[in-house]
From Swiss-Prot:
This is Serine/threonine-protein kinase BGLF4. It catalyses: L-seryl-[protein] + ATP = O-phospho-L-seryl-[protein] + ADP + H(+); L-threonyl-[protein] + ATP = O-phospho-L-threonyl-[protein] + ADP + H(+). The active site is at D195 (proton acceptor). ATP binds at L110, Y111, H112, E113, L114, M115, V116, C117, D118, E128. Residues 36-40, 344-350 are annotated as: SUMO interaction motif. Interacts with host NUP62 and NUP153; this interaction plays a role in nuclear targeting of BGLF4. Interacts with host SUMO1 and SUMO2.
Length: 429
């Protein structure tokens, strides 16, 4: 019996007539009162989320179905009047008050993101350490309309345009929260985001037009389970038992992260595979290891932070970070090598400025101890690096040095990119 309840039922709380007298108490939140979710709380919460219908231990397969509220079209009409963004999945529109609706061209893409969003939401319901605060919530879904409803934010970090001295503190604080969110996704939800970039980081509203609000991670359209999960085969079925979708976990390096924000370890793998003319079959690949997934997500987050640093410093837009756009076809090994050049040069500049020792396994002088870069390709890489260094000198980057003196910024960059290395096995290679 709960200690407080026992006290209420003790003889000292009885009236002289022998009747039970319970003193009224001010209302208290369940979380604050009990410290965690109760069984009844779980029942009232769970009926709105994915339900397990069967577990096949022989094949290690988990079968789930959608709750009824996701299959009913009982939301406000979707007008598609105010377009907020568009992508390969479909489009995002403003919806009702302070909400957005993400409309999918394909229902299978909706099923994927909806399943991942719901898994995260279930994880957030039992979170106690606050690491989940920088993960976007979803409000509801409608499979009939191919729609996912979410809170409204000002814009993505990629579209944010008010960079000034006052942006430094919220940028650092925001990325510290995003780092916690990546750990929460990996360790509490068993998920690999695999597509962290400024376009998938949302900026919240503030009281002023020029203030940077909190940063929130979104877009789980390519998220997958990592190998630390007990079951990796998760299938969504209809109420009549028809299979609607199978949540994949097989990943190969070309499909992980946007090419512009691929960590150096992934760029090196893609460079090697393209040079050998080898294209991996995704169905023959396994799930990404939990630690590898964590490292890759943190590294992509680190290069997204460098994007913010560049916008704080390069008001002339002379430095093409992260995309040099050299016009190579994706089948050319140089296509992947080109994205390494701005990362290497920028990190060398920051290492010198902050007195850090960031060994990335590739230098602007042409040192590549773990990857055999051909002489022709290295010559091209060195030319890119020389051009980038010239652009740094022509920009206002070095005039903005005071903006980089935030006490936590150097350590945060070093922590996020600590394990990245231009080699097929990363830092451990």
């Amino acid at each position: 019996m709960d200690v407080n309840m026992a006290a209420e039922l003790s003889p000292t709380n009885s009236s002289s007539s022998g009747e039970l007298s319970v003193s009224p108490e001010p209302p208290r939140e369940t979380q604050a009162f009990l410290g965690k979710v109760t069984v009844i709380d779980y029942f009232t919460f769970q009926h709105k989320h994915l339900k397990v219908t069967n577990i096949d231990d022989m094949t290690e397969t988990l079968y789930v179905k959608l709750p009824e509220n996701m299959t009913r079209c009982d939301h406000l009409p979707i007008t598609c009047e105010y377009l907020l963004g568009r992508g390969s999945y479909g489009a995002v529109y403003a919806h009702a008050d302070n909400a957005t609706v993400k409309l999918y061209d394909s229902v299978t893409e909706l099923y994927h993101e909806l399943m991942v969003c719901d898994m995260i939401q279930i994880g957030k319901a039992t979170a106690e350490d606050g690491q989940d605060k920088a993960l976007v919530d979803y409000l509801s879904a409608c499979t009939s309309c191919h729609a996912l409803f979410m809170p409204q934010f000002r814009c993505s970090l990629q579209d944010y345009g008010h960079w000034h001295d006052g942006s430094i503190e919220p940028l650092v604080r925001g990325f510290q929260g995003l780092k916690d969110a990546v750990y929460f996704l990996n360790r509490h939800c068993g998920l690999f985001h695999s597509d962290i970039s400024p376009s998938n980081i949302l900026v919240d509203f503030t009281d002023t037009m020029w203030g940077m609000g909190r940063l929130v991670l979104t877009d789980y359209g390519t998220a997958s389970l990592h190998d630390r999960n007990k079951m990796l085969d998760v299938r969504l079925k209809s109420s009549k038992g028809r299979q609607l979708y199978r949540l994949y976990c097989q990943r190969e390096p070309f499909s992980i992260a946007k090419d512009t924000y691929k960590p150096l370890c992934l760029l090196s793998k893609c460079y090697i595979l393209r040079g050998a003319g080898h294209i991996p079959d995704p169905s023959a690949c396994g799930p990404v290891g939990a630690q590898t997934a964590l490292r890759l997500d943190l590294q992509s987050l680190g290069y997204s932070l460098l994007y913010g640093i560049m916008h704080l410093a390069d008001s002339t837009h002379k430095i093409p970070y992260p995309n040099p756009d050299m016009g190579f076809d994706r089948s050319d090994p140089l296509y992947f090598l080109q994205f390494a050049a701005p990362k290497v040069v920028l990190l060398e500049v920051l290492s010198q400025m902050w007195n850090l020792n960031l060994d990335m396994g590739l230098t602007s002088c042409g040192e590549s101890p773990c990857v055999d870069v051909t002489a022709e390709h290295m010559s091209q890489f060195l030319q890119w690096c020389r051009s980038l260094k010239k652009r740094f000198k022509e920009s206002y980057f070095f005039n903005c040095r005071p903006r980089f003196e935030h006490p936590h910024l150097p350590g945060l960059v070093a922590e996020l990119l600590a394990d990245d290395f231009f080699g097929p096995d990363g830092r451990r290679g």
